[in-house]
Regions:
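Cyclophilin-like peptidyl-prolyl cis-trans isomerases
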Residues: 1-160
Length: 160
């Protein structure tokens, strides 16, 4: 049985994505994501940057890649215990390793060049086909016009 307190249900237009949270690797990031999910912060936010064969990035309330929550930045929680593979959920940040806030990305494919350089806080366990269906961006930036949205994101323990 899954640990419902450390499981997220992300509803997309095509269906549910289940994400196992990894508090053993990134306790502060997991706590932040759960807090924001419980506030409804992610509901209606978009996947603003989506690069084919790499990742889908979301969690920015402005939809531009420059926004975040009002909870401030988080210190990096890097690990070498686990690498970036298909379905890994990582914390997006600026060039400053201690600048993560609310944005995250989900990997379409392995990306070993990210290992130990970005915080891993989750792993998709169901619904990766729905992640694969997210609208892709154009050009090298991956910025998406008319992007797909997160319908809702909830902690499984709260989803009746």
């Amino acid at each position: 049985m899954a640990d419902l307190e450390n499981t997220l249900y992300m509803e997309l237009k095509d269906g549910r994505v289940v994400i196992e949270l990894l508090p053993d690797l990134a306790p502060r990031h997991v706590e932040r994501v759960k807090t924001l999910a419980r506030q409804g912060f992610y509901d209606g936010t978009v996947f603003h940057r989506v690069i084919e064969g790499f990742m889908a990035q979301g969690g920015d309330p402005t939809g531009t890649g420059t926004g975040g929550s009002d909870l401030g930045t988080l210190p990096a929680e890097f690990t070498r215990q686990r690498g970036f593979v298909r379905g890994t959920v990582g914390a997006a940040r600026t060039g400053d390793p201690n600048s993560a806030n609310s944005q995250f990305y989900i990997m379409f494919a392995p990306a070993p060049h990210l290992d130990g350089q970005y915080t891993i806080w989750g792993q998709v366990t169901e619904g990766m086909d729905h992640i694969d269906a997210i609208k892709r961006g154009a050009g090298g930036s991956g910025m998406v016009s008319n992007p797909d949205k997160i319908v809702s994101m909830k902690v499984a323990a709260d989803a009746g």
